[in-house]
From Swiss-Prot:
Organism, as annotated: Shewanella baltica (strain OS155 / ATCC BAA-1091)
Family recorded in the similarity comment: Belongs to the UPF0246 family.
GO cellular component, one term: cytosol
Name this polypeptide is given: UPF0246 protein Sbal_1048
GO biological process assignments: response to hydroperoxide
């Protein structure tokens, strides 16, 4: 199985990584193009474009200015240890074994507005550039047009290398929109997580994000290879619901 997840806004570049093993992102020339565009933006432009405070806009203007593609452990960190936030809290990479971390490198891919498609051990420098940002660039009016078919092709290549034909989409809609499902060369599965609130089951963003991270970890640590094995996911009180599921959207429920 190849797993797709979103990145996180929250970053941790303070804690040292748990391994000295790393790789370099595949699309750094693309990243450089975007950085050049972003460097032309004033902090006030960034604040408007990204809908962030002046303080965060200033921080990211500085990050764009400092960014350079010669990554090492001195100025960058592996993506899986740099990203924090709900999905990554659920995934809890810090407690994986060396073998499990190595397994993530072939099975997990992180979609990114700046870096395109990241392997877990790819080095990244601090940034904020969400996939849904309407950043005008030489290839179009937003990042979806900038990346075009590039990320879909990269997912297909990663799927072929993984030896599987199942793609488990645990990314948000904003990020998965950068992928063209009809061009994927595998079976696409997009799990849904619902929590019971006031007697009704519904997707609650905070819980769903954590559940996506937990499922990604479950696939890695349990060596899940089939849809039947995926349906056995039962962490944090979730259970598979045949009634609420469809062939492409296995649905997991959790009671109040």
């Amino acid at each position: 199985m190849l797993i797709l997840v979103s990145p996180a806004k929250t970053l941790d570049f303070e804690q040292p990584p748990l391994t000295q093993v790393y790789s370099q992102p595949d699309f750094l020339t693309h990243s450089q193009e975007l950085i050049q565009v972003c460097r032309q933006l004033a902090p006030s432009d960034i604040a408007t474009l990204m809908k962030v405070s002046d303080k965060i806009a200033g921080l990211n203007a500085a990050r764009f200015g400092e960014w350079q593609p010669d990554f090492s452990l001195d100025n960058a960190k592996q993506a899986i240890f740099a990203f924090r936030g709900d999905v990554y809290t659920g995934f809890d990479a810090d407690s994986l074994s060396e073998d499990e971390i190595a397994q993530t490198q072939s099975q997990l891919r992180i979609l990114s507005g700046l870096y395109g498609l990241l392997r877990p051990l790819d080095l990244i420098m601090p940034y904020r550039l969400e996939m849904g940002t309407a950043l005008s660039n030489p290839k179009g009016k937003n990042l979806y047009e900038f990346w075009g078919d590039t990320l879909t092709q990269a997912v297909n290549e990663a799927l072929a290398e993984s030896g599987s034909d199942i793609i488990v989409n645990l990314a948000s809609n904003e990020y998965f929109k950068a992928i063209k499902p009809k061009k994927l060369q595998g079976q696409l599965i997009s799990p849904v997580f619902k929590d019971c609130k006031n007697g009704q089951y519904k997707v609650i963003s905070f819980f769903a994000k954590r559940a996506r991270g937990m499922m990604a970890r479950y696939i890695i640590t349990n060596k899940v290879n089939t849809l039947a094995e995926l349906k056995a996911f039962n962490l944090a009180g979730y259970y598979y619901s045949e009634e609420q599921s469809s062939p492409t959207n296995p649905t997991f429920l959790r009671a109040e």
